Every structure is written in C-alpha cells, then in structure tokens.
Amino acid sequence: VLPLRLEELTVAGRGRWEVRGEKLSVRLSGVDPAPAYGDRVVGMGQLRRPAVPWNPGEFDFAAYLRRLGFSGELEVDGRTGRWERRSSGHGTWLMASALRMREWIGEAVTFDIGDDPERAATVRAMVLGTREKTPPEVEAAFVGSGTMHVFAVSGLHVGMFAVILWNVLRLFGLRRGLVVALTLPLVFFYVYITGLRASAWRAALMAAVVMAGPLWNREGNLLNGLGGAALVLLAVQPAYLFQPGFTLSFGVLLALALLHRPVLRLLAPLHEPDPFLPKELYTARQEAWFWLRRRVAESLSISVASTLGSAPLMIGYFRMVTPVGLVANLVLVVLSLCILVVACMAMAAAALQWPLLTASLNHANWLLAAAGIGSAKFFAAVPGGHFRVDPSRLWRGSVCEVTVLALDQGGSAIHVDTPSGRHWLIDCGGRRHFRRSVQPHLEMAAVNRLAGMVLTHGDSDHAGAAELVRGAFGAGRVLGGDGGEELRAGSAHELDEGVVLRVLFPPEGWEAGVADDRCAVFMLEVHGVRVLLLGDAGFPAEKHLSETGVDLRSDVMVKGWHGSDHSGLPETLAASGARVVVVHRSHFPPSEDPPPGWQRRIAECGMQEVDLGRSGAVVLRLRPGGVELSGFADGSRLVLPSTGSVGVTVTGIAGRVE
C-alpha cells in the first residue's frame, strides 16, 4: 500500500478528470520492484471508494483515509494491468532524507540480530514505531499489560530521546543555548522519521517549550505547554481531534498535571522520612534508602495518575481496563528507556563503522527486548490484570442482543449477548474472518470469556476459526463440532435465565454425506420472541422438518444457503410465519446467491427481507415487547412487536365442553 498524489486521471468511458493534487491509496500486487518515494508512475487499475466496515468493531479504513486526506482507493495488479515508472526524484528533500534515515536506523539497530524476528521487530518498534513485522501475540501481550505506549513510538519515547540528547550534549560542556539549538532539530527530525504521530508531535512541542523557555527567562508550565501544543496541532491538522492517539496522549498528560501531586501526597507515608530525624544525622545508607523510596513513590504516582486519566478513554475506544498497568509500567518504561539508550549507542557505533561494537550493543538490546516481551506476557497473563467492560450495560436494561455478522463467501457467525452479560457464539466463521471481523467484534462487545460456542456443522466457513476463538476468548461449553456436546433434535440448552436454544434438527441417527445436510437448526427463544436459525440447511433437512411437524413458528428467520441443493422451500417459509428473514445475498460463490423464485416466495408469505450484503451486520435486540432490528452499515431500523405465539406444554384438568 502506498500513497499517490495525482497529476492526471483518465476514467474508462468518461475521459479525463481534473484531479491534480488529489491523493489515492494504492494497493499494489505483482509489481517488482516496488515504487520508491518520489517516483513518477503511470498505472491502470480499479478505482473505488474505500470499503466501509460491515461489522461492529471492524477497523474503519474509509474514515481513516478520509482523515488523512485521501480521495479514494486504487487497486493495481501488475500482472494483468499497467504499471510503469517514468522518472524519480520528485519528492521533497526532507521526506526523502527521513525515509533513508529510517531505513538506515532500522538496519543499524537490528544488525546481527535479524535471525530472531520477534526480538528484532520489538527493538525496531520501540525505536522507530514500525509494527508491520511484529507477531500478533507480542502486540497482544503489550496491549494486555497496559503498556502499548511503551511498545510503539509515542510521546514517551520522544521525551526520552530528548533527555538522552540533552544529557549527552551537556557532557561536552556546551552552553544551554547551543544544547537547545542542537537538540530540538534532532527531536523534531526523530518525530518526522517515526511517522508524525500526534502524541510524538505533542511531546516534541512541549519539549521545545521546556528547553527553550529559560532562554527567555520563562519557566515551563505543564498545563500551558499542553494547551499550546494542542492549539498548534489542531490549527495545522484539525482531524487530529478524532484520532485516539491524540486524545489519549493529551488526556493522560492532563491527568498527570492534575492528579500527580495529590496522588503523591497520598503516598507520603511510603516515602517521607521520619520528621523527627534531622537530615544532618542521615547516614549514607539512609539517604540512599530515602532517595529510592521517593523515586518509587513518584513513579507509582505517575503510573496511577496516567492510568486514571486513560481509563475512561480506553473504555470508550477499546472497551479495555488494565489495572495491571500500574505495576507493568514501572518495569517496562525502564526497559524501554534502556533499549532506546542502547539503540542510540548502536547507531553511533554504526555511524563510526564499528561493526563489532554495533553487534555487541544490539545483542544487549536483544536481551532487553526479550526481557520486555517476557515481562509484557507475564503481566498480561495476571488474572484480572486486564479485562473488557461495556458501559452500555448501565442503561440498556434486560435486552438480549443477537448480532448476525456479515461475513463474505458463505461465512457465518452469530453472537448472542444475554441480559446478564453471558456471551455465546453460534458458528465462528473461517480463519480468514477471525482477525478481520470476528475478533474485533467480540473485543468491542467486551467479551472476556465466552460462556459457550455452538458449531452447527463442519464447514470451514462456519467452524474454521474455532481453535482461534477458543485460544483468544475461551469457551465454557462447546456444543457440536469435533469433541463438543452432541446436538440432538428435541434437546434444549439454557444460555441464560429466560434464554433458551432449542435444537430442531438433526434427529438422532441422521446420516448425510454433505456437511450442509447435517447442519443443525435452532430456535432461540427470549422474552416470548422466537428466532429461527436455519443455517445452511437444505432440501433434506427442510423436508424432514415439515413432514415431522416441528414447530417452526417464529418472529425472525436467519437463513444461510445450502452449498449444492435447494433451500428456502415454500412449506418451510409458510410454517415459520416469520415477518422478517435475514439472509446474505452474494454473487460469489454462486451458491450464496438466492435460488430462482426466492423473492416471490417470501412476498407470498408476507416476509420482509434484510440482506446482510446491504445492511452489514444485523443486530436483533430482543425485548419482552418484541424485537428491534438495526443494520450496522446502512443504519436501517425495523421494530416488530411480539406476536406472543410461543409453543408451550401445559398440564391441567379439562372442563365441560361448551
């Protein structure tokens, strides 16, 4: 993926468009060598709007590109389309220099440790902020330990880099003005080569105020510096206001400014010496002990204040609370500082062309990176050290939310969030769906652990991600699938109080050669509302249900498509009586396209269709009074009052027939 500033655009059948200066995000494949910064190129490809998220929790790439000023997305395949480099050297000198320096630093700080990708990627991420080659489990460990700001370049790293430069230059006896004049350009250049992050800009601007202020007899003030940095950044780029990095960075610093001293006063018993012992009588050992206690208390107060400041924002953005970060930051911030110091020494050795010293320093950083990864994994594994919370539970009431995810190519996953907060997953999609859709949705839904997972049948697009789901979210019970509890028609499973999942199909002893013919069919009953989950059941299953008189009455039907047979039979639709049917229309694969006559059948039954391909994920909110359906992508909304037609079994004494 690379940004492209347009000079000319010609659209097939529409001629040339006036687009000079507009930016496109280009996805390249089959192009070797890849274009470099400043190349003038001519290409042919598919121009489109960036895809919007279809499921809750998915990354909104379209909004991200809009904030960065991109007008659209271009996909180019060099094997079938045209991609030609005309000339080079058309970029700015500053950006070209920054990119060359970034590449040189990446090679210098990982010299001789590249055979360990995990540690090398960690060092590179902490020094340069590049996370492309970082294993997902390493990132997850830093997120779970509440130390992600330590892992990726942030305002913390810029501040540490400024302190390192300041102290090194002061060792040479230079005057303050000269030290400031040398330090600040290097600090801003570091911000430039590490990606121009809002938090890094904030730290650089505040460092400039703190360092340069005394030259004009001005004392630094944290709140003034914070406000000034915010004013400058928002004046240059107002879109920063909508970036989590910006609000988290400024929110944490604001909390530090307001809460650090009050928290330190509360910790006074931990660090203040005996007031009746004169300082003149301190021994060297006591002085060292009091100094250490003071530093620990200050570090702890900073950690507490920053955690309190970031907690509301972390809940709002990521549904995450990390109390273990109070302690983890004390360890990992020190390790991060050590890694940055050693990396600066390695860069100096590489610049002097001392490969042996460079390799030795990088091996020291390898050990520090290993300690950092190990510490992050240890703190992330502490029970209760991090957990997800959903603030909407404070006001949503006794609602059962059923989210039917919109997954491509026949994938299926349905998330059931019961009134008391128990989470169940009915099918889990394929492996390709997990990181893109299923995992982000469950994280945004504040799932700490699944109460259970139900696997309807052995289709890789329905159950392929089962192991990934279990590894990330656990599962108290597993119904269906290999090693799970058997799904048998007539059985009922209570997912929560008042939330029942009844198995309608398959019956005991059912034999079928195709996986879709063994697909389980369920009736979900909540608050008197019934949702029929037909899955990929086809002709044999639907015929069996209609011939055996199984009660299919429901308010909403959720239906997939059989991979090779007819489904959606008229008798099934009529027996259901559902007012809404949720399906996913797709032209690929062909089996995911509705069969001929489908629209006529549902019209004859008075059903309204909700297409996941248009609405995105559909959220069903089941209440005692009925069900509300809302589309995630298109914002559609439909409210159905409950019919109250719930199948029951009664026992009593018959009276006289009138």
Specify the residue positions occupied by each region the protein language model found.
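Divalent metal-coordination and catalytic microenvironments
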Residues: 45, 126, 154, 195, ...
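Di-metal (Zn2+ and/or Mg2+/Mn2+) metal-binding site signature of metallo-dependent hydrolases
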Residues: 147-172, 448-473, 534, 560-571
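Core dinuclear metal-dependent hydrolase active-site scaffold
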Residues: 131, 234-235, 242, 376-452, ...
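Hydrophobic alpha-helical transmembrane segments in multi-pass membrane proteins
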Residues: 74, 134-325, 366, 370, ...
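Active-site environment of divalent metal-dependent phosphoester hydrolases
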Residues: 158, 198-200, 432-433, 458-464, ...
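Transmembrane helix-bundle segments that form internal channels/tunnels in multi-pass membrane proteins
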Residues: 83, 168-178, 254-407, 413-422, ...
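Cap/insert and terminal regions of metallo-dependent hydrolase folds
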Residues: 358, 542-617
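Membrane-interface helix/helix-cap signal primarily in integral membrane proteins
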Residues: 1-149, 389, 436-440, 449, ...
